[in-house]
């Protein structure tokens, strides 16, 4: 026999060791496993969805959201609600690719890149600290703006003290509702008209309302 036929036979024998047919049965499970791993991996996106509301004229855990002392206060039969946004995918609240994909398909959610919300590499501790700082600044600015308004309308606010209590809510966007709630407490004007009114917006110490994100 010639050399070429022997090489062909040897090649066929080697080929049997590497029969690709068994891989056909493994390809499906391998692809499925890879897909699952991708879906459960942390996402590089932030998911924003509607969050809970809080009545600034009411209480949270037994404490008045807006506690005013040193002046006469009044009750409002209605509610002034501050609205919030639930954010997943921020430091300390990871979101998977699967969750981001489902949110992308939902008309009630917004999906945006993480770098548009917080600096890359920011820790959960620093994120929470910054968010709480924004909330504290928002409350202080709202109190200052409300006092300026009340004083301009003839109310004596020299002895007025204000403290605000709210749990698990950060950011600056509740300032407008805090200011309205404080003014309503002191004037007794029933700003709600006995109804339930929801609102949002930042507010600086001079009473200027600013834009907010996420809603």
Which residue ranges define each predicted feature?
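Intrinsically disordered, Ser/Thr/Pro/Gly-rich linkers and terminal tails that flank
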Residues: 1-173, 180-190
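Glycine- and Gly-Pro-enriched alpha-helical subdomains that act as flexible
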Residues: 171-192, 197, 201-215
């Amino acid at each position: 026999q010639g050399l070429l036929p022997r090489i062909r036979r040897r090649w066929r024998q080697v080929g049997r060791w590497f029969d690709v047919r068994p891989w056909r049965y493994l390809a499906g499970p391998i692809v499925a496993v890879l897909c699952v791993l991708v879906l459960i991996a942390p996402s590089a996106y932030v998911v924003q969805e509607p969050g809970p509301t809080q009545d600034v004229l009411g209480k949270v855990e037994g404490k008045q959201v807006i506690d005013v002392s040193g002046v006469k206060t009044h009750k409002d039969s209605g509610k002034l609600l501050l609205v919030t946004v639930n954010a997943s995918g921020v430091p300390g609240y990871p979101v998977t690719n699967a969750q981001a994909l489902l949110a992308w398909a939902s008309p009630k959610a917004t999906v945006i890149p993480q770098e548009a919300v917080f600096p890359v590499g920011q820790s959960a501790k620093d994120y929470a600290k910054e968010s709480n700082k924004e909330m504290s600044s928002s409350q202080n600015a709202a109190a200052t703006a409300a006092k300026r308004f009340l004083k301009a309308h003839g109310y004596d606010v020299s002895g007025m003290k204000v403290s605000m209590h709210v749990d698990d809510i950060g950011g600056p966007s509740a300032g407008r509702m805090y200011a309205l709630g404080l003014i309503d407490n002191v004037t007794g004007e029933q700003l709600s008209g006995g109804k339930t009114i929801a609102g949002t917006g930042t507010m600086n110490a001079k009473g200027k309302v600013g834009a907010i994100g996420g809603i």
